[in-house]
């Protein structure tokens, strides 16, 4: 009986220590799709605007035509804009954890980091390579 209690206790501890991925795949797929659309608008605005953007948030606002409703699904997260010469990308982060990374120059959502071990919220894509 002592061994059974010990085994059950160990299993309980292991189950508690292994925290399941807290992100729902369906919700993350929806967010990735919306982020992809915004990233494409971001990239197009950067490439075809007469404005030389150095500030990511200004580029984001111009890309969504100041329609902040497009950002509502991301309210519990942080969106970071990456500008690398004539290319742009978006990072979706949960505090300092990178969830999704999307280069606006590609048709698909580029990196679904939320499925992997936690990564720091910083760009991992080399836009000069991805976008050429």
Predicted region positions:
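Bacterial signal peptide processing site
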Residues: 17-19
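Mature cores of small secreted peptide/protein domains
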Residues: 21, 98, 110, 126-127
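N-terminal alpha-helical signal peptides/signal-anchor transmembrane segments
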Residues: 24-50
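Extracellular/periplasmic head regions of type IV pilus-like filament subunits
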Residues: 40-43, 47-104, 109, 131-132
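Short, low-complexity, Pro/Ser/Thr/Gly-rich segments in the mature regions of secreted, periplasmic
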Residues: 114-132
């Amino acid at each position: 009986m002592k061994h059974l209690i010990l085994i059950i206790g160990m299993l309980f501890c292991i189950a508690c220590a292994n925290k399941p991925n807290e992100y729902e795949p369906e919700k993350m797929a929806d967010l990735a799709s919306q982020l992809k659309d915004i990233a494409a608008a971001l990239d197009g605005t950067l490439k075809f605007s007469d404005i030389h953007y150095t500030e990511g948030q200004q580029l984001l606002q111009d890309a969504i035509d100041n329609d902040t409703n497009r950002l509502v699904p991301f309210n519990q997260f942080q969106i970071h804009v990456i500008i690398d010469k004539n290319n742009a990308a978006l990072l979706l982060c949960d505090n300092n954890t990178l969830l999704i990374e999307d280069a606006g120059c590609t048709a698909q959502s580029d990196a679904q980091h939320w499925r992997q071990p936690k990564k720091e919220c910083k760009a991992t894509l080399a836009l000069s390579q991805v976008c050429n």
